[in-house]
Amino acid sequence: KNIKEAKVDDIVAPIVKTSEEAAKTFDKPVELIFIDGAHEYEYVKKDFELWFPKVIDGGIMAFHDTILWEGPNKVVNKYIYKSRYFKNIGTVDSITFAEKTKENKLSDCIQNRYFLFIKKIYQTICIYPRKFLVKVATKCHLIEPLRKCKKKIKKLTKKEK
């Protein structure tokens, strides 16, 4: 129903199977995969390992619940932000997305680590009392970089629309 309403039924084919069952028989190249399953680390990692080889260079991997859920958070931190096979990483709400590449450049690595740093600051602000952290961020001059990061994320998401 949602796929038809979004008018993407000509390019999106829903598969009603577990991720593991679907990956075993899925033999087409994947341009976009959205992983939203169990939140335990081992399951998210398994989903990543099953689908990563099927995603084409230039394709997008996206993961849901990557901010406050430990499993998805650990997987994207290790296999996306710290990987040499992803660039143009972004976060919208609780979704982290990245473009697969054969091997990223040094500038991509630096940008990925920078966004990981900003993400960790954002997570800290969500988890701990906000007032205290705003004071610390102000004293450490982190407010402006956070605002710039938010603007960059908005620009990246607008380009994809």
Question: What do the predicted segments below correspond to?
Answer:
Residues K1-K161:
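S-adenosylmethionine/decaboxylated-SAM
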